[in-house]
A protein has these predicted regions:
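Domain-level signature for soluble enzymes in the chorismate/prephenate branch of the shikimate pathway
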Residues: 1-380
Length: 380
């Protein structure tokens, strides 16, 4: 037989499979109608487990895993169809509806905003992108930014979560597990690192370079080209620039933003020294209370899933079944819980779509712990 003959066989089989799949989904919808009429839940976990075991036992050993995966997905699709018919709701969906109805139409222009660092830090530049004229309060640590929000000292906080070169800011993701907050907006900020020193300093004079660990990582190739130079970590890039300005020395420099040149009376010895020219950091704006502004098309979630095979797959298959795009998946180990993780998800979906509402009704039941962090727009 030729390849075309095999493909014709596959096409014929696919036609039969599709007809049976449509028939199966139609019966699943009728079951959903019955469950709705008799006030029954969409999920019958015992029946699903028994059915999957029966399928696994009857399948050829070489195809057992494939068969179980296929039927697991079909069960997810059937349940999603039934949930839509049942109009699944939860306290979370009610909370989201309330936030949409009571959030003002315009994002605030002059609020009190906490950020880590000092004047000239990239977090402060992100504040300026998010707000017209923010009243910025500087904190020594990211932890202090979260605390300022929880205690009501500031309405908002701005924190970095990931960089296009260096990846996720793990310290921030770890703090997310310890604090109560909501995300109300995000921004992507172009990061352009300069090597700054006191007036009169020459590149050949530099013996020490100060900066934040993320900036150091983003400029690794440049730093490797400077043999004999010691790299010193600081709490943030602007603090590094300030330290250089106050040192009285011409043999030290800082990797910091161009804004620090005028702020601290420094000069640029080298510009755009990051490894990648297309270098962006994503910041999120956090608040104590849930606010959902018009146009929200991104959602962030945190989940602890049951510690058993297939738990993550069940969540991902929900996204797939509802046609919801996953922008980010991050996992962080849970403190004092061996080999267990908190999963962080960023989803691309309109907060107004029926698929989003259905997802928010279904997901909490799949998790040991579930946190809806917010739905928001990203400024680019």
């Amino acid at each position: 037989m030729e390849l075309s003959d095999y493909r014709r066989q596959i096409d014929d089989i696919d036609s039969q499979l599709l007809a049976l799949f449509y028939r199966r989904m139609d019966v699943a919808a009728q079951i959903g109608g019955y469950k709705k009429a008799h006030n029954l839940p969409a999920l019958d976990a015992g029946r699903e487990r028994a059915k999957l075991q029966q399928i696994a036992d009857s399948a050829p050993e070489a195809l057992r895993d494939y068969t179980v995966s296929l039927y697991s997905l079909m069960f997810e699709l059937s349940r999603s169809c039934q949930n839509r018919l049942l109009g699944i709701t939860s306290p979370l969906t009610a909370e989201i509806e309330h936030a949409i109805a009571h959030t003002p139409p315009l994002f605030p222009e002059h609020p009190a905003v906490a950020c880590q660092g000092v004047e000239g830090a990239y977090s402060q530049l992100a504040c300026d992108r998010l707000f017209t004229l923010p009243n910025v309060f500087y904190c020594a640590t990211f932890d202090a930014v979260f605390s300022a929000i929880e205690k009501g000292l500031c309405r908002y906080g701005v924190i970095p979560v990931e960089n296009s070169t260096a990846g996720s800011v793990n310290a921030v993701y770890d703090l997310m597990m310890r604090h109560n907050f909501r995300i109300v907006r995000s921004v992507r900020l172009k990061i352009d690192h300069c090597l700054l020193a006191r007036p009169g300093a020459q590149m050949s004079d530099i013996k020490e370079i100060y900066s934040h660990e993320q900036a150091i990582s983003q400029c690794s190739r440049f730093l490797q080209s400077l043999p004999g130079v010691t790299v010193v970590r600081c709490e943030n890039t602007a603090a590094a620039a300030k330290r250089v300005a106050e040192s009285g020395r011409t043999d030290v420099a800082a990797l910091a933003s161009r804004a620090c040149i005028g702020l601290y009376g420094l000069e640029s010895l080298a510009a755009s020294v990051q490894d990648q020219g297309n270098n962006y950091t994503r910041f999120v704006c956090i608040a104590k209370d849930l606010e959902i502004y018009p146009g929200a098309d991104r959602t962030s979630l945190m989940m602890v899933l049951p510690h058993k095979p297939g738990s993550l797959y069940k969540v991902l298959s929900r996204f797939y079944a509802l046609g919801i795009n996953l922008n980010k998946l991050e996992s962080r180990p849970l403190p004092e819980r061996d080999f267990e993780f908190m999963f962080y998800f960023d989803l691309e979906t309109s907060v107004y779509s029926p698929q989003f509402r259905q997802l928010m009704g279904e997901l909490p039941g799949l998790c040991e712990e579930f946190s809806y962090l917010g739905s928001y727009q990203e400024v680019v």
